[in-house]
């Protein structure tokens, strides 16, 4: 994978000022972003998150998922610590794209769960790839993370690229009546570590 650094700039946010680093995957043409705060290249494990793009949750305030809540929670945690990094990866809809995500939502409106909808459309349950994270983190001088995630697949992916996950930091945010079944499905079918509440619901949904 050929991921190259393009440019960096300051990015003031409600949580504090980050540095925004832009990267281009020359093979796919996708543009990825890293937001960093503080000295993250000192060798110590860095509080971090891999966040896949979710237009509906991150920008349109959707309550169907927990993505927007996790994005805000991760940025707030980094700002509170004064040091950390968030990789914003252009992998909308767990890798199936925005329009296919809307198609999946339509199937979910008809009774399918989030995994069943993907499969009915001919996709895998989760088509994301995290190979771009290695060159992005290498450019930033990061080799060890305290990873904010509920997804064990992200931990395994990073470790397969020789990035140390020194700690998994739970990021359980945004449970509501609209996403309760969605989160239960992620726990029951995708192995996300969301606590006994979601696991129990997944087993009975």
UniProtKB/Swiss-Prot annotation:
Q: In the UniProt record, does the keyword Magnesium occur?
A: no
Which reaction is recorded as catalysed by this protein?
GTP + 4 H2O = 2,5-diamino-6-hydroxy-4-(5-phosphoribosylamino)-pyrimidine + formate + 2 phosphate + 3 H(+)
What biological-process terms (Gene Ontology) are attached?
A: riboflavin biosynthetic process
Q: Where does GTP bind?
A: 49-53, 70, 92-94, 114, 149, 154
Task: Name the SUPFAM superfamilies for this protein.
Answer: RibA-like
Asked if the record carries the keyword Oxidoreductase, the reply is no
* Domain of life, per lineage: Bacteria
Q: Give the metabolic or biological pathway.
A: Cofactor biosynthesis; riboflavin biosynthesis; 5-amino-6-(D-ribitylamino)uracil from GTP: step 1/4
Q: What EC number(s) does this enzyme carry? A: 3.5.4.25
Gene Ontology CC terms, in alphabetical order: cytosol
One annotated GO molecular function: zinc ion binding
**UniProt cofactor(s):** Zn(2+)
Task: Specify which residues bind Zn(2+) according to the UniProt entry for this protein.
Answer: 54, 65, 67
Provide the cofactor note recorded for this chain's UniProt entry. Answer: Binds 1 zinc ion per subunit.
What are the entry keywords?
A: GTP-binding, Hydrolase, Metal-binding, Nucleotide-binding, Riboflavin biosynthesis, Zinc
What is the residue range of the signal peptide feature? none
Q: What does this protein do?
A: Catalyzes the conversion of GTP to 2,5-diamino-6-ribosylamino-4(3H)-pyrimidinone 5'-phosphate (DARP), formate and pyrophosphate.
Family per UniProt?
A: Belongs to the GTP cyclohydrolase II family.
The name under which this protein is listed is GTP cyclohydrolase-2
From what organism does this protein derive?
Pseudomonas aeruginosa (strain ATCC 15692 / DSM 22644 / CIP 104116 / JCM 14847 / LMG 12228 / 1C / PRS 101 / PAO1)
